[in-house]
């Protein structure tokens, strides 16, 4: 990936996890291939991926996944950090959501804030996790699985 260019799509962990599966969803793989140079992940997603890896028992599968995650995922997708700008956006989102009574996971609001701070489209299968955030912000979401999203 050319790190001089800004990515347009921020991939959620469920999208990245799909790449790792032995039989990944065709639509997801096609979209990633089509937009590869326009895709990035963020630090909270990277943490979720590594956490999943570190929880695995030692063995061939863990060694394979470790190599794939560090050699392919890490090398192909720029990692967007949780910056001061994203922190301010997240604080605003959480305050707005609290006023509406809409619950949201702290990690989801961090991911959304990073997408908003970088003017990116969040790509996730879990669109329902971000519905309340969309209602109080200009967050754009795409579901590359093509289904209606999961809760």
Features from the language model and the residues they span:
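Nucleotide phosphate-binding site architecture
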Residues: 16-17, 47-50, 131, 142
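Alpha-helix capping/helix-boundary segments
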Residues: 15-16, 45, 86, 110-111, ...
